[in-house]
């Protein structure tokens, strides 16, 4: 039987990565615990994976090391350890020991050196070794006995894995690090040499640093970009390169007080773990130990008739009040006015905020205590309720007072409901809620935008370990589902009160985590929360659409679909149902013999849109026709047929809903209708925009940021060439074309500019040479040459991309200019396709996310100005980087100037933000 491997865990590496890469957690008292939980989860996973193995969990000791003596600047660039990480070290150490793992800290050296010593010692005794780490330095230890695993990503690395990832063998890793340096440890390396150049040099000389310096004369002949300039650079920084070699070398001879025989697991200390889990509020782990202990007791106990299961811990006692009398209402109104912060929620007859009717309002001022004020429950036998208008008039000063701070869950919906509540039947007499300080949906979203659900029920389970009463529990399902006004107060009251209570409790849990990361707290308070009332106003304003024009377009699209269907039948040689995947698959793959690019989960050849798009790119006629048909069908069903049905009978307008907590990058999305998906590059898509019209006496004004993501790229990369192009107001695509095609600016053709535009935007989205070649109609080799020329002209862009990939892999997330985080769970995946996709996201997300933050800040600035000025102009739509306003004709010039001014001031970048403004009678004309 093969020997179980020695498992060596790089505790310090995992502590850092868990703290930075995982969403933060805190106890109810504000103690940070997320990193502790992340590392312990990893250790538990390892223990299950290697149940028979000896273990050591190794952490850095306090104080300096021999490397600090060698180089005073070693790790000097690192910010001091965050306090929220520092306070987690001691409970983590205690938890590791209580779980039964040997824990090692050795003064004067780093955890890497202790691990290196133990690993080499074990390998010398022919025992296999698994090093659990996320640190690339450890790759130098890999050999026939030693393997690296990264439990946080599920990846592993042997000798071949090292070669695949770094382009060099394990024995060359120290040389590799010596050349490129390591920014995280402030190892200097040779300036200007990155990962690809370092590996290219070492492979080129078939050796290490020593061999490289002995063969500098052959370096100019190596197939490396800029090879001719490298010998001088290497010679100039030779001393630093060899110092870097020493700094990057892991010691394998550290004197230790323990031997391999001392590194065995022991039984967990349950009492200590219960104490720690209570302190850290790891409720599920606490319960798990209790259950295990109970099972052991029951198994060991003699058979008896009176053994009784232990009762579950009682939940905190709640006091939920349904208010039906004036005295109770007055008492609660005073309580709300005296509170520093209160939670509120509305109950309604539906989920369309522009048409639903208000049924009741709930409030909470402290955890586990809440009240519901029913207003219009009308089921048979419903008790008498307080007068709706009297209650709303009493609540109005409180809800409209900006100094009375409020928290909601998806507060925009409640704001719209109350704004539309029409007190006394007067549509203009609503409640304009002010003082929204927090929104738990947005707090959750800002903490981790890649999480899929930010609804109250999901958040309560995740952050409070609490199961809420669902709407279906009290209203039923399907066609027989009751509206809220028909639900008896015995059920409706506690349900509604719970909504307010849980909202307040969620805020307390989420706010503690956000304040631990100031940059995220700033994103919430400076960007997301101020935007809530702005979006609410835009939604209520709505947009005017020409239903008659849409009807004409619908007929035209239908006629085009009939013609495309005829063409499809002609190509196929028979009639078939274009909407049937089965029939379509038979035609494409069996009859016409097209290549099968992808299969469904059931093993059938796929006819999905991305498959048809790829086949259409490859010039197969039927997929081209099918793609056109599907495009027309989508426009017809989603817009020309549907938009007239979405006109609100009360306002005569279409009211889209904007979503702040959906897109991971921070971008807004919309629904009913989805404005983002109206195509702008096709004539049919542009015609749909023609149906969004200005009322008589008004114009539509469209204000759009010009090339905003490229400008953000220039700012983030600090590339002088790109920044100068924007600072000098050059057409950046023309400037790029002049560089790539080696012509003067005045000689650039429209085709060359189009190709340069594809290069500029393609590289932002991580496009490779093959895809670029297809897009601009050249072979892959030529496209690669264009990319090489581009990076030679804009070297800062390449450096930014490499730096961003490395930082993302190291910390597990990227950030926007304003500090918004995007977590990348696949950035260290051992599946190349997943990792490559995450790397593309890492490069693009800071730009797309920063653009999203900028337009959000611009919306707030514009709204503040419009509100203060009192001008007859209103924002009616927001799409991507564009705002659309409805402006009285005589104010167009003034508003155009001010819109440019405010949108340009939304961010201070190293290049100017330029805003293009267009005006017309419809949305399309305004472009």
Where are these regions (language model features)?
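Short alpha-helix plus adjacent loop in nuclease-associated cores
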Residues: 22, 73-88, 139-168, 230-232, ...
